[in-house]
């Protein structure tokens, strides 16, 4: 996908497109969500510093192939850090990998993605919570740090003193 987008952008093929069309390419491919079959997919997205991205991704992809659980789609992007309290952005790169859920491989995928979390944390990386359904509280605590989580929980208590605003993602990672 990245190569096709790059080649399509070379002169004389330049063109304007909307922000959404550029960033959410698959939303414009009819029926793309059916490509993974009835079981669907699990997406895993990591953000790694420039210095450690290649080595960490190499380790993750080797593990994926050793387990017989290859990513069927991968998208990489360049990122810069931001000042958001729970930011996933680093001065480096992200890789979003889509894994097919089929034939009873869900538990094996979950186990492998938790190993990916350990690789990412060891490499100084971060996660995109909304895409990483298998990330556990321990991995979140290791990459954000106790101070950041404490600050977030204080902010949550101040803005939501009755605890009415809580998603499953919040309960899984922070409660």
List the predicted regions and their residue ranges.
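Noncatalytic alpha-helical scaffold of FAD-dependent oxidoreductases
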Residues: 1-175
């Amino acid at each position: 996908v990245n190569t096709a987008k790059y080649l399509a952008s070379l002169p004389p093929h330049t063109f304007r497109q909307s922000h959404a069309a550029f960033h959410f390419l698959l939303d414009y491919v009819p029926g793309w969500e059916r490509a993974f079959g009835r079981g669907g997919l699990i997406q895993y997205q990591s953000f790694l510093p420039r210095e450690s991205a290649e080595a960490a991704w190499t380790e993750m992809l080797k593990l994926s192939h050793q387990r017989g659980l290859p990513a069927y789609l991968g998208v990489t992007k360049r990122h810069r850090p931001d000042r958001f309290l729970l930011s996933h952005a680093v001065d480096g790169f992200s890789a979003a990998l889509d894994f097919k859920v089929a034939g009873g491989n869900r538990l094996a995928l979950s186990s492998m993605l938790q190993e990916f979390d350990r690789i990412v944390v060891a490499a100084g990386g971060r996660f995109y919570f909304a895409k990483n359904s298998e990330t556990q509280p321990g991995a979140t605590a290791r990459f954000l740090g106790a101070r950041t989580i404490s600050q977030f929980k204080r902010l949550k208590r101040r803005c939501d003193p009755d605890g009415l605003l809580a998603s499953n993602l919040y309960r899984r990672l922070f409660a």
